């Protein structure tokens, strides 16, 4: 089997570390691995698959000779992606920098793999909450046109990176010992006001826009339409940060053009790759972050008719946003390209 020269930009962060875990787990065929990060992390040693790697500072020349560049996200993507493409690498980017660029495919491999072939050097990985939702929407969309979607999310602190996870852990420890918790990260680190996340919910993920939606909510709306290739769908979203370490959950209400039976919906979901149907109310079986953390698949349950609206179903979906919502989805894109001789 051919092996590929791979670079990981942002190798020391949560998504970058997950890339390494998945490369080993999935036996991704690499001949060279270049770990890149900011100047702050340069020189750090990372042990991986029996070898010690030194993290290098990212520069415009960092991608010479690289076949596949996995970008873990962040502001560096916009700066370095053009340099990587110029050097001949294919960039799979986890940031929001290129997602809505009409020249850049926005891809979930189970949903719209055909879009990959149109790339011009960069392929965008969707937002984590978007990926999880469209995994649930696609099997339903294939059996009936969707008219409207209402989604509310319950998003884990790891969506805010290592800092978010550390803050929850520190706050829980402080409260358990009778101390005052310190908030410095959530909802948005760069904003002046921060709130305790331990034993709390924060109805703000990212900054507010002029329409009073947050950027996270608009990402879900805009990205879903692009991935599904359907601008007619009406979508509204409310995104909430919850005191869970890992795995996002979403309550999704879907109105269809025509009636969809529960039997047809269950059959479509159960047959779809990357989804586990965990839906047995009589036995109290339903998806929870506890079940999906560190797993590849997303899980769907609580499937039921909406008693208030015709041709409408409700479902509950959970997925590991660091895996399927980020690193796994990006690696699956690379695997698809290898399998179809696109790299």
Stretches with model-predicted labels:
Residues 123-132, 212-221, 325-329:
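A glycine-rich, Thr/Ser-enriched phosphate-binding loop motif common to dinucleotide/cofactor-binding enzymes
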Residues 159-162, 209-212, 244-248, 262-263:
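Short acidic/glycine-rich loop or secondary-structure boundary segments that cap or lie
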Residues 192-244:
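Oxyanion-binding "anion nests"
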Residues 1-197, 232-234, 286-288, 298-299, ...:
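N-terminal Rossmann-like NAD(P) cofactor-binding subdomain of oxidoreductases
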Residues 232-343:
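C-terminal active-site/capping subdomain that shapes the small-molecule cofactor and substrate pocket
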Residues 117-124, 200-211, 315-317:
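Helix-loop-beta segment of a Rossmann-like dinucleotide-binding subdomain
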């Amino acid at each position: 089997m051919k092996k590929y020269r791979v670079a990981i930009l942002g190798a020391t962060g949560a998504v970058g570390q997950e890339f390494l875990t998945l490369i080993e787990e999935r036996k991704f065929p690499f001949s060279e691995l270049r770990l890149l990060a900011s100047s702050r992390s340069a020189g750090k040693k990372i042990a991986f698959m029996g070898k010690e790697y030194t993290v290098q500072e990212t520069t415009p020349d960092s991608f010479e000779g690289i076949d596949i560049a996995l970008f873990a996200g962040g502001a560096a993507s916009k700066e370095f992606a053009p340099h990587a493409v110029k050097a001949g690498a294919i960039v799979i980017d986890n940031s929001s920098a290129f997602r809505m660029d009409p020249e850049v495919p926005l891809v979930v491999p189970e949903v719209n793999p055909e879009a990959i072939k149109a790339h011009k050097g960069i392929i965008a990985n969707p937002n984590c909450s978007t990926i999880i939702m469209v995994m649930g929407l696609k099997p339903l969309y294939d059996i009936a046109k969707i008219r409207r979607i209402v989604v509310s999310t319950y998003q884990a602190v790891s969506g805010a990176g290592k800092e978010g996870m550390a803050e929850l852990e520190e706050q829980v420890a402080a409260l358990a010992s009778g101390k005052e918790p310190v908030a410095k990260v959530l909802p948005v680190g760069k904003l002046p006001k921060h709130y305790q996340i331990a034993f709390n919910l924060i109805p703000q993920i990212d900054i507010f826009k002029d329409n009073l939606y947050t950027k996270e909510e608009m990402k879900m709306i805009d990205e879903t339409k692009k991935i599904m290739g359907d601008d007619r769908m009406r979508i509204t979203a409310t995104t909430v940060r919850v005191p869970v370490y890992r795995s996002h959950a979403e309550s999704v209400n879907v109105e269809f053009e025509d009636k969809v039976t529960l039997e047809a919906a269950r059959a479509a979901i159960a047959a779809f790759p990357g989804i586990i149907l965990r839906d047995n109310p009589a036995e109290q079986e339903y998806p929870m972050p506890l079940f999906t953390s560190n797993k590849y698949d997303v899980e769907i349950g609580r499937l039921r008719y909406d008693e208030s609206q015709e041709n409408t179903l409700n479902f509950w979906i959970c997925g590991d946003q660091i895996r399927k919502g980020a690193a796994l989805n990006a690696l699956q894109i690379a695997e698809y390209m290898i399998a179809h001789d696109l790299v």
